[in-house]
Amino acid sequence: MEANTRSTGRLPAAFLTPGSSSFMDFLGEHQPEMLPGNRQLPPVQGVIEAPHGTTIVAVTFPGGVVLAGDRRATMGNMIAQRDIEKVFPADEYSAVGIAGTAGLAVEMVKLFQLELEHFEKVEGAQLSLEGKANRLSTMIRSNLGMAMQGLAVVPLFAGYDVDRGRGRIFSYDVTGGRSEERHFATTGSGSVFARGAMKKLFRDDLTEEQATTLVVQALYDAADDDSATGGPDVARRIYPIITVITEDGFRRLGEDEAAELAGSVLQARLEQPDGPRAALL
């Protein structure tokens, strides 16, 4: 049958048989060995050294949500990559920022993108934002075996909810547990420092421009205290990846926009190295 379909150019029957709208279910039925959760690693001694993505931040504003990430990947105490991309569109109205084991995280994002695309093609409509968040939770849970060996993936998921007319943020733990964050969220090695900055600077009435400035300030503070987080690198023209999701869909700021935004933050830091100060009362 396989040889016949190859010679005729026809798709195998499995591709033409009605079934689940989940691409993961399809793989699980026909090619289960391709699912990340079905891989078995040999027993290892100690920690597996692999590049890790670090800090991701997200913040809502009245018109949508901003998701951003630094560009550094580390392997132990070494900088493995200076310009890694950690923020990806999931579909037209959502995005994923990755922290944890970089290779597995990027693979999970690609599978997630396929999952959403497959559902839309089969059902003729997009999943709700909550449904997308639940699908990602299932994928993270399937990686638990890898996480137990030190290869964890802990992303942030953000998107514009077209039904509710606002931006939403979902955070996860290593077991796939999902929580919706009210205003802002962080993940990765510099998350505690970034969260502290966002907690002091967040306001309910942020404009889109202020929200993008806030995430750069938060990433700068994270890089200031966490060696695994990379700040803006003017010499190499490496700047944070900043994405905005509104009712118009997903948009990534261009390099010139990111450079201008990072430049304004760096210029202000010459006067106030510790960043903007929040009012005491």
From Swiss-Prot:
Biological pathway: Protein degradation; proteasomal Pup-dependent pathway
Propeptide residue range(s): 1-53
A matching Pfam family: Proteasome
Active site residues according to the UniProt entry: T54 (nucleophile)
Quaternary structure and partners: The 20S proteasome core is composed of 14 alpha and 14 beta subunits that assemble into four stacked heptameric rings, resulting in a barrel-shaped structure. The two inner rings, each composed of seven catalytic beta subunits, are sandwiched by two outer rings, each composed of seven alpha subunits. The catalytic chamber with the active sites is on the inside of the barrel. Has probably a gated structure, the ends of the cylinder being occluded by the N-termini of the alpha-subunits. Is likely capped by the proteasome-associated ATPase, ARC.
PANTHER family cross-referenced by the UniProt entry: ATP-DEPENDENT PROTEASE SUBUNIT HSLV (PTHR32194:SF0), METALLOPROTEASE TLDD (PTHR32194)
Entry protein name: Proteasome subunit beta
Source organism per UniProt: Streptomyces coelicolor (strain ATCC BAA-471 / A3(2) / M145)
